[in-house]
Amino acid sequence: MIDRNGYRANVGIILLNSQNQVFWGKRARQDSWQFPQGGIKSGETPTEAMYRELAEETGLQPVHVEILGRTREWLRYDVPACWTRRDWRKNYRGQKQIWFLLRLLGRDSDVSLETCAHPEFDAWRWNQYWVELESVVEFKRQVYRQALTELSRLLDHEAGLGNDRAYREPLEPVEKNRKKSSDTRQS
């Protein structure tokens, strides 16, 4: 669903564990890390799309998570033409996203990256809420900052995650591994 301004409706997911660490997925066959995200299909609500994308990319089901909140407005980023499908280039500018903040109620072992034929991620890890975003593809960094900042208000009182904690801890590379192991996540 591309709107008249050229933005595809999409959802993004910031998933927290019980220590308020954030789930990061390593893009399959790439060196970039990102949050789970994906397009909203025709007839789907953002919440329905979020649960579908969560299941497709992490194997987690609604019973495994609790919704803590979502962004108030659409957050947008433009996609460079070299990253755009050739048949979309005429009408497509980028993504507009509603971001959800979720709490994992299940266990790490509930995460499975192999729930579909072409997994989005080939490794995953937990990391601190505020991290350096160098491992995120450049054109997505600003929207990540916006989503993390807006949704941190839901955790400020509970966990002391004030907005002044500016992206200090870098994501460190890990071994490629389709299945989560103690080597691919930070405790």
Curated annotation (Swiss-Prot):
Cofactor: a divalent metal cation
Keywords assigned by UniProt, alphabetized: Hydrolase
Catalytic activity, EC: 3.6.1.-
Motif Nudix box per record, residues: 38-59
Gene3D superfamilies tied to this protein: Nucleoside Triphosphate Pyrophosphohydrolase
Region (Disordered): 166-187
Domain of life: Bacteria
Hydrolase recorded as keyword: yes
UniProt keyword annotation of Hydrolase present: yes
Pfam families associated with the record: NUDIX
TM segment ranges: none
Enzyme class label: hydrolase
GO MF term set: pyrophosphatase activity
Biological role: Accelerates the degradation of transcripts by removing pyrophosphate from the 5'-end of triphosphorylated RNA, leading to a more labile monophosphorylated state that can stimulate subsequent ribonuclease cleavage.
HAMAP family given in the database record: Nudix_RppH
Family assignment from sequence similarity: Belongs to the Nudix hydrolase family. RppH subfamily.
UniProt-recorded name of the protein: RNA pyrophosphohydrolase
Source species: Nitrosomonas europaea (strain ATCC 19718 / CIP 103999 / KCTC 2705 / NBRC 14298)
